[in-house]
Amino acid sequence: MKKLALAVLTACATPPALAPVAPVTWIADTSTYAQTTSQTNAPNAIADRYRGAADRILAAGRDDRGAYQKLAELTDTIGHRLAGSPELDRAIAWAVATMKAEGFAVHTEKVMVPHWVRGAEEGAVVLPNPRAIRLLGLGMSVATPKGGITAPIVVVHNWDQLDAQKAAVKGAIVLFDIAMPAFDAHAPGFDSTGYGKTVGYRSRGAAKAAAYGAVGVLMRSVTARSIATLHTGRLSYTDLAEGVAKIPGAAITTEDAQFLARLAQRGPVTFHLKLDEQTLPDTESANVVADFVGTDKADEIVVIGGHLDSWDVGQGAIDDGAGCVIMMQTIKLLKTLGLQPRRTIRVVLWTNEENGVRGAAAYAEAHKDELAKTVMAVESDTGGAAPTGFSAGAVDKAASKRVVARVAQIASLLQSLQATRTIETEGETDVEPMGPAGVPLVGLMHDVSTYFDYHHSDADTLDKVDPQTLANDVAAMAVLAYVVADLADRIDSP
């Protein structure tokens, strides 16, 4: 799950070579992006001060396969890690043991999380011609009544069509046949993926359809490219009107969504849906916290992290195993190089991002007395492909501009990785709760041109991560973390 307001600037699958000039910085507001290029002779005191350390990190980081080895252990020996599952418990224990063995101070912090369990799932066209339809229940969906639901299908392609057909929706299963736009490398920020244009139907569709009396929903999988792949994701009942019963929801392949839409154009379609999902009482999980303790400013903290949980399909390699191991290997690389910064770099592996975000909320609450001395919080939650730069910002607008400018200076050290882009954004899901306390929020950005081909599906497996690009991610992250943790002043200071 990603924060929809987040603008993630991406590169083409094969980015063009960079000319030997100052980096391009993208500055974004809510809708308009302005390209600014600094002069080649413009002063960059941060880059000048840390170029030697950055070169050491980049040279060592590009050849370091530690992150990939960690990711292979996590995905191949544990696998997917839904909140409340034994697999997530094992992953937490693995992360603690791994970072303790590397010499870091590690502990866990209790978090109570939702406990949703997938059961048997069935889908089929009943009329006009019987045909089985593969499906995948949406996370947090309620179960169907025992024996399932058999009802007519109503196909909609947007919210207006749902409103216009509200009379037909009563007693029906609504199919949200919403095509995710293809990746557009020329579109700014998160618009390049098309995810933001479609994911709202997955999360809010059931509540809206239930308001008109629907008995269930089907969602076209949120992906632009499919080879009959099913993509799950969180279904939310937050918008459900008082007194309206929750209804079940499932994802179907883009191919089957189009098939059902064509059938419905020819005449009535009846569908059978059966989901045996369970929502059990909340259960105990934990955030993992590991400190690479600083020197003379050790009480000040740079938080870097990813979410250790995943959906219950695939291996959770790109979402978000890659983000976790990038951060774990960042402090390992710096320690190996003997680059101990002035401030403490803290790795946080959050629990329950996918279906509750309770780990993020719990961390911000548990550490509220430290947030005034938390100088930056970074998240990586868009896979393990090539790094392209950083999103950055702060709640205070003036401070946000300063943060973006300084992160851009640091990113200029990453020209050899073609990771110099910087945009101003609101922050990603797990770091966002720290924003109101004034913590600068940063995201490690990646090439996401293929990310949503595998996202939340059985195809999210280790083979989708290239060892070299993952090593480059670690190198980019280590440069940012080290410089910010070692600077004389905070990156948001006037």
What are the language-model segments listed below?
Residues 51-53, 127, 134-136, 140-166, ...:
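Soluble metallo-hydrolase cores and metallopeptidase-like ectodomains found primarily
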Residues 62, 130-132, 146, 151, ...:
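Metal-dependent peptidase/peptidase-like ectodomains
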Residues 46, 50-54, 66-71, 78, ...:
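Stable alpha-helical elements in mature extracytoplasmic
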Residues 332, 336, 452-494:
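His/Asp/Glu-rich mid-to-C-terminal helical/loop segments that flank catalytic regions of hydrolases
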Residues 42-53, 61, 72, 76-187:
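Noncatalytic luminal/extracellular "stalk/propeptide" segments of secretory-pathway proteins
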Residues 99, 201, 209, 288, ...:
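Alpha-helical metal-binding/catalytic segments enriched in His/Glu/Asp
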Residues 85, 134-241, 246-248, 315:
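Extracellular/luminal Protease-associated
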